[in-house]
Each structure stands twice: as structure tokens, then as C-alpha cells.
Amino acid sequence: MTPTRVGAQIVEPAVFRVLVEMETRKAQRMRYVVSLVSLGVDEGGTSPAALAQRVAPAIRATDAVAMQTGDSVTMLLVDAEDTNLPTIMERLTPGLEDISWSAGGACYPKTAATADELLNQAERMREQAKRQGGRRLSLPH
């Protein structure tokens, strides 16, 4: 009997991009939402691989995490409203206490109309959180 995997699957960036595109198409057809959170380390201290290992167990097995260039990861959160993102980040924060981080979120179709917009918006929001001092989640208004 295979043990049940706990937490999100960590995938390569190219696979992640395909997953985001597929989920936004499914979300449009099935009328649900898809959110992304871009989480970055502001002052070194951990690699994207280590960051992915920290966050993956704290999110659902139906979600995905990808290491990005630089010191960041992006989380695909299926059927998670943008209003749920602060609660999700609260769940992740205990595993991030020893590093300086910034996060940005976006939600399809609420704040972004395409997969590209979703990815870009999450990145922009992360940069905004970093400019505001870090250790926070920034969301579009």
C-alpha cells in the first residue's frame, strides 16, 4: 500500500505554467476560482528548493508549488478565493519565522483574466509587499 502524500506537489516551472493554464481553463468552464501566491525571500537565507520544501506540506495535496528564478516560489491554489489567501499565509508563516519574506497574490477570474495576467499579477504584488517592508502578503484591490 502506497503512503498518502501530504501537502502540495513540487513541480518544475514549465510544468507549473502548464498547470496554471489548464486550471484557469477548467475554472472558466466549471466556474470556480484559482489563486496564485508568489512567495520570495528578501534577504537570502534559503534557496527556492528549500523554500518549496517548507511551504508544500502546509498546503493541500491538490495544489502545486514551483521554484522560480531568484529566491522565490509560486503556489497554485485551486478553488481558493483571494479572501482565503491571508489565512493560507498565516498557516505558512510559522515555517518562515527565520527568514525575511514577501508574498503577492492574485485570483482568476476575480483579479486576473488570463493565466499570464495571474502569474504577472502575483509577481507584481510580491514586489509591492517587498517595497512595503516585507513579511506581508500584498493583494490587488
Give the location of each predicted region.
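Catalytic core of bacterial cyclic-dinucleotide metallophosphodiesterases
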Residues: 1-5, 70-71, 139-140
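Active-site-proximal structural segments of metal-dependent nucleotidyl cyclase/transferase enzymes
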Residues: 16-43
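Catalytic/regulatory signature loops of cyclic-dinucleotide turnover enzymes
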Residues: 97-102, 121-141
